[in-house]
Amino acid sequence: MDKRHDSSRRIIAPHGSQLSCKSWLTEAPMRMLMNNLHPDVAERPEDLVVYGGIGRAARDWDCYDKIIEVLKRLEDDETLMVQSGKPVGVFRTHADAPRVLIANSNLVPHWANWEHFNELDKQGLAMYGQMTAGSWIYIGTQGIVQGTYETFVAVAKQHFGGVAAGKWILTGGLGGMGGAQTLAGTMAGFSVLACEVDETRIDFRLRTRYVDKKATSLDEALAMINDANASGKPVSVGLLANAADVFAELVKRGITPDVVTDQTSAHDPLNGYLPQGWTMAQAADMRKTDEAAVVKAAKASMAVQVQAMLELQAAGAATLDYGNNIRQMAFETGVKNAFDFPGFVPAYIRPLFCEGIGPFRWVALSGDPEDIYKTDAKVKELIPDNPHLHNWLDMARERIAFQGLPARICWVGLKDRARLAQAFNEMVKNGELSAPIVIGRDHLDSGSVASPNRETESMMDGSDAVSDWPLLNALLNTASGATWVSLHHGGGVGMGFSQHSGVVIVCDGTEAAAKRVGRVLWNDPATGVMRHADAGYEIAKNCAKEQGLDLPMLKD
């Protein structure tokens, strides 16, 4: 019997202001762990899978139950240690120390590959935490919507004079991360055709309003796209088809999309990508009997897809890798020019990272959407001169359905994170909000990740693979008083290709919380400015000087 599967489980986090734990500092991680497994949030909650192939919230159901049990008894001077989804120890620390410290999927570099990890996983000795799955701060597909939106807006500016109307994006994948592409694309003004092999995922995105229409043939999908482009009103279409088949067929037909990308779970060829010609059931059976054959077939199909992406690029499509490591998989399968199209971070996002700007997110532990709407208004009040940000918040309120506990994401940087957090804490203190707020972020942030094929691709000083930076980030956030801190390996791009850290902090309205959030939410984005300034980026150097960062090696 698989201890990770239990179809009888239906996890819903408590709402309201009544505590189940001894304080909000332990109630918050409990609720956020549970929220990760909410049926409207997780991809396969019965298997503890939150998103991203096999990204889990806990190692197995026994470990999940024990984590909840420990959090309910944990004192405010104790810290729970979680090793790859398993609660392994409780230690006396102090009130400003994290209540939970998490390490997921970390392997000594020589053994940091899928083959070794999968053996450990089968033996119950490891868990793939992805980024926010095992660090308990996943908020559903909204978590990546704004980053994807910002990328597509940048694509429109760079390639189409800022006008996306009448243009369309071809992509693959409608899972927890990929599902953001359709909504983000239409928000940016593009129509989007997204290929997905799992019909239940398309239906999930339809239900949560991330996809507008479903198609079962390429001709039907193209007709929907053409009609939308003719009308000037963008549409998103989920096409039930294999991305490799569709991308290659468009090359054959001589049809060139305006933008081409992909967000299938290509980072995990065993569990995340369906080979061409295979059914879902066939793949599930083969994963049990011949893992090597599945991996080989999946990577061969990825090679077909990437070759098609290269040909579409040559035909004029703006083509970008969206961080799932599909170029690497194709390169390993013989597509030697797989890296001829860029990753999205160096092409579009890095200037934001240089100022510590990244995916700041917060969640209303009350479960009351009004708490989020009040914080939206506070953000506008405190950042009055940013119409782009205001437009994002307006669109998010109108078009993004909350999944599980109400949440918001908004890309802000070093100048704003700490003061927003302190304002939220004050709102809790004076009763404007009905319960505390938790603030976190994706591990995809400016100072918290080393990932040479994604966030740190093509660093100007060649330091792409240096992973001291996320380790320093985790250490500093721990020292600064975050509520829980995590250190992971392999998120986004798979085993051996990334190391990254996460941070979450509670705004419970106390003076102690005000001091903690002031430290954590200044220091955390400041490490991103530090990292990019150290690599030589002038934007980061200027930001560091303007904000008074003490960087000893930064020349005047």
Swiss-Prot record:
The main place the protein resides is cytoplasm
User: Which reaction does this enzyme catalyse, per its entry?
Assistant: 4-imidazolone-5-propanoate = trans-urocanate + H2O
Write the Enzyme Commission number(s) for this entry: 4.2.1.49
Q: Which domain of life is it from?
A: Bacteria
Q: Residues in the active site?
A: 410
Q: Which SUPFAM superfamilies match?
A: Urocanase
Keyword Thylakoid assigned to the entry: answer is: no
Listed A to Z, the keywords are: Cytoplasm, Histidine metabolism, Lyase, NAD
Give the UniProt family note.
Belongs to the urocanase family.
What is the purpose of this protein? Catalyzes the conversion of urocanate to 4-imidazolone-5-propionate.
Supply the name of the protein.
Urocanate hydratase
